Each structure stands twice: as C-alpha cells, then as structure tokens.
Regions:
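N-terminal beta1-alpha1-beta2 submodule of the flavodoxin-like/Rossmannoid cofactor-binding fold
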Residues: 1-77, 83-89, 155, 159-162, ...
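Alpha-helix N-cap/loop-to-helix initiation residues
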Residues: 11-15, 81, 113-116, 150
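FMN-binding flavodoxin-like domain, especially the glycine-rich phosphate-binding loop
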Residues: 25, 29-30, 101, 106-188
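Flexible, active-site-adjacent loop/turn segments at secondary-structure boundaries
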Residues: 38-41, 45, 78, 93, ...
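Helix-loop-strand module that forms the ligand-binding subsite of alpha/beta enzymes
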Residues: 55-131
Length: 188
C-alpha cells in the first residue's frame, strides 16, 4: 500500500508537525506500507495552466505523479483566511478531475481557533468529492492550544491521529476487496 501525506502549505510549522506525528504513527502501525511525505514548502511548484499533469517538469511533475500513484492520501492543511492555502488549491488544479478515483483521502487540519472547523465541511470535502475521492468521514482538527514548541501536547489529538491512520488503511483494504469482488463478476 502506498500512502502519501501532503503538508499543504509553504509557510508555518504546525501542519508539518502534525503530519510528522501522523506519518510516524502510520510507519509504526503499518511497517510494510510505502509512506511518503510531500511537504509543499520543500518543492518549487508552478501554478496550474491547464496542461495535463504529466506535461509539467521538475518538482511539479514529481509531486503530481507521486499523488497519482498513491492508494491513500492524508492531507494536512492549515486554515488561512477561513480557507485552504493557495499551495494546496494549486495541487488540486494541477490534477485531473478524476485524480482521486479509487483513492482513499483523509484529512487533518490545523487552525488558530475552533471557529474554522467548517472549512473542511464546506470547502475541502466538496473538492475531494468532486475529484472522486473515497473520503474518510472524520478528520483531525488541531487548534493552536494543542501545540507547544513544535510538539503536540494534547493526548486526545494523538489518539485521533491514530484513529485517522487506522481508518484510512482499513478503508483502502475495504475498497480493494470491493473492487476485486466486482472484477470477479466479469468472466473475461
């Protein structure tokens, strides 16, 4: 199983910290999984101009091809101005409409206050649904108060991250079995 984590901003440290924790949990629980972090702060991405993602070069091509090859994607995003960051939106714009077909996508969100939790429901989930993702219904929402010196200090957040990883992997396994059963119906 190939899992790609996306740290969806090119500024700040909280989302990257949360993604590091989450992917470490995934590595410990599922050592056979191929797990990669794409921290968008570490890549020089160009803005989407409507081309097919395979026509781009450099970091843009690397990032989009890694996402397209994944079985599961864990998106980490901060909330900026009550919305997703432009760097993450650009990733969605670079990919085809059906980019997440047969992929499981889960989310964790960092925000300054609890008032921004609806961003996931009203913006991120509709984008992922439009792109045909199998969305893990629950997500991890982490507030400013849950961090101290680039560490997560809320044990409940760690527990929810563990559950998010488990739900993501279980959903991938379930969809693999469903597709195999569906394919077995055809006798050619």
């Amino acid at each position: 199983m190939k899992i790609v984590g996306i740290s969806g901003s090119n500024v700040g440290s909280k989302t990257r910290t949360a993604m590091d924790y989450t992917l470490q949990i995934a590595r410990e629980k599922y050592p056979d999984a191929d797990i990669t972090l794409l921290d968008l702060a570490e890549y020089e991405m160009v803005f989407s101009d409507g081309r097919d993602y395979r026509e781009y070069e450099g970091d843009t091509k690397v990032v989009t091809e890694m996402i397209m090859a994944a079985d599961a994607i864990i998106i980490g995003t901060p909330v900026f101005q009550a919305s997703i960051p432009a760097t993450l939106k650009n990733i969605f714009d670079l990919l085809p409409v059906n980019a997440f077909r047969d992929k499981v996508v889960s989310m964790l969100v960092t925000a300054g206050t609890a008032k921004h939790y609806l961003m996931v429901e009203q913006q991120l989930k509709p984008i992922l649904a439009y792109m045909k993702a199998h969305i893990v219904p629950t997500y991890v929402f982490i507030e400013e108060k849950d961090f101290h010196r680039k560490e997560i200090i809320n044990d409940d957040v760690i527990f929810r991250m563990e559950r998010l990883v488990e739900d993501t992997v279980l959903l991938v396994d379930a969809y693999v079995k469903i597709r195999a059963a569906k394919d077995a119906e055809y006798d050619f």
